[in-house]
């Protein structure tokens, strides 16, 4: 659906996702290798601990991926755009900066 050529799992299982330095560096290395133009992460306004950790982890890894003096695989890279998506476990309605209408793709998503 997204046209992504590869899906990676960094070995961080459900309910055991934590924002640690080890996890940040692991993700930062993947960011350096893949050089994404955009990162997506959960909005850090959520009741689910994994979603909060994923948000902090993505922000931290994005920051560390640009450092020149870290011995990580790949060349330093700074992802220019970071977008947050809402999981709405709190049923909160944040003041979004923009919304994307996915209604024409919803049926395919449900497959």
Regions found by a protein language model. Give the residues of each.
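Metal-dependent de-N-acetylase/amidase catalytic core
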Residues: 12, 18-111
């Amino acid at each position: 659906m997204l046209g992504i050529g590869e899906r990676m799992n960094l070995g961080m299982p459900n309910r055991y996702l934590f924002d640690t330095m080890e996890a940040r560096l692991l993700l930062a290395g993947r960011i350096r290798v893949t050089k994404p133009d955009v990162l997506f992460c959960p909005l850090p306004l959520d009741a689910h601990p994994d979603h909060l950790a994923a948000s902090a982890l993505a922000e931290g890894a994005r920051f560390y991926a640009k450092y020149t003096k870290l011995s990580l695989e790949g060349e330093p890279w700074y992802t220019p755009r970071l977008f947050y998506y809402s999981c709405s476990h709190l049923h909160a309605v944040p003041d979004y900066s923009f919304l994307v209408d996915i209604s024409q793709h919803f049926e395919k998503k449900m497959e």
